[in-house]
Amino acid sequence: MSEEQKEEQHEHIMSMQLIQEECAININEKIEHPPVAISYKTKEVVTRDGEVKEFPIPIGTYGNFSFIQAHPKSMKTFFVSLLGSAYCNPNGTHTSGLSSFREDREYIHFDTEQGDWHSQRVFKRIQWMNKTSNLDFYHTFALRKIGFRDRINFIEYYLQSLTDAGKKIGVVVIDGVADLVSDANNLEESNLVVQKIMAWTTIYDCHIITVIHSNFGSDKPTGHLGSFLEKKAETQIQLERDPNKLGAITVSCKRSRNTPFEQFDFRLDENGLPKVDNPDDVYSF
């Protein structure tokens, strides 16, 4: 074996030893449940000690990712605004039942589909819903103008730059994840993007929310990319229009690694802002 081969073998062994240290799980060590980022309502649990405790039902936890799927024009971006508003202000008037646990973390929204004007209008909804412009932890980017590889690289760069500046990443929105690949049916690229998302959630201890279309005529997310998201996501959220309720969008938990959150509806208020339905609400517009 040449010296060069020995060096390569040594580097390989060191790399595998590092992976072994990072990935080994001690079954006798207590690992805490990942902290909740955004939740909908709560549940009561009886502990092994017989104590009754109330816990938030997660939509997403830190260190994991979720994705929203729906057919075109099902108000996916409005729902993203609803989650973002709840994350920025859990006591808002539009987000009944939704809670968040932001503490001092940052909220970052990457839009890949819309031009600057439409993107800004979406980003500003959170200001309008909370009647404030004092959101210095809220970072917004419209990435339509750059290529899919540059989008991946920029997201990675920006998350790292915030971390290097001493910031803690909280929730990251990527609306839409299909624009991080050349084709949602490209197996290699789809796998790479989902692996990237999983790595980012681990490295930055954040929750990532992605958005993807459903296939025409089915409830499956688009392409190989959608299949990879289904396999790896903590929570799969589905939006559907309810023909029996005026203007309502039904939000359901299609899959979850946690207790599934309860189905709920939202619709636009008289100002065109998304609002969770309350039983006492009366809609006449």
Residue ranges of each PLM-predicted region?
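Short, surface-exposed amphipathic charged segments that create phosphate/polyanion-binding patches used
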Residues: Q5, Q9-H12, F148-Q160, A248-R257
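Phosphate-binding/switch region of NTP-binding enzymes
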Residues: F67-Q69, K73, T77-F78, N191-D281
